[in-house]
Amino acid sequence: MRERTSRRIMQRFTIHDLAAIIDARAASGGDASYTRKLLDKGPAHCARKLGEEAVETIIAAVEKDRHHLIAEGADLMFHFLVLLKASGVTLQDVEAVLAQRTAISGLEEKAARNRD
């Protein structure tokens, strides 16, 4: 029964839930909060951590290690959201750009970006 409950909870967990957790930890934090410690070190530190996680994700993909890729992908998403928070950017800001980009073809969007 517990496994089924756990699976149901995981199916409902979204990136928005993770962003909300990061927001809450940023607000309350404390010595025990890894998130708060990252944020306290500033955007440059958060960017370096994101880079480290990106490399680990790439390695997992190249090695075709599915389990490791999933775990590193989760770390990558977490650190990306922390970097956004540290930089004063919201997930909704990123989603708005994605919505604009998906309104036209990828090639048209890329060409428009290159002109800017």
UniProtKB/Swiss-Prot annotation:
**Reaction it catalyzes:** 1-(5-phospho-beta-D-ribosyl)-ATP + H2O = 1-(5-phospho-beta-D-ribosyl)-5'-AMP + diphosphate + H(+)
Gene3D superfamilies per record: MazG-like (1.10.287.1080)
Chief localization class? cytoplasm
For this protein, the record's Pfam families field holds: PRA-PH
The superkingdom listed in its UniProt entry is Bacteria
Annotated CDD domains: NTP-PPase_HisIE_like
Q: In which pathway does it act?
A: Amino-acid biosynthesis; L-histidine biosynthesis; L-histidine from 5-phospho-alpha-D-ribose 1-diphosphate: step 2/9
The entry's localization annotation reads: Cytoplasm
Root EC class: hydrolase
What does the record give as EC number? 3.6.1.31
Q: Which UniProt keywords apply?
A: Amino-acid biosynthesis, ATP-binding, Cytoplasm, Histidine biosynthesis, Hydrolase, Nucleotide-binding
Q: Which GO molecular-function terms appear in the entry?
A: ATP binding; phosphoribosyl-ATP diphosphatase activity
**Which biological process terms from the Gene Ontology are attached to this UniProt entry?**
L-histidine biosynthetic process
> A single GO CC term, please?
cytoplasm
Family the entry assigns: Belongs to the PRA-PH family.
Query: Which HAMAP family would you find in this protein's record?
Result: HisE
UniProt-recorded name of the protein: Phosphoribosyl-ATP pyrophosphatase
* Lineage of producing organism: Bacteria, Pseudomonadati, Pseudomonadota, Alphaproteobacteria, Hyphomicrobiales
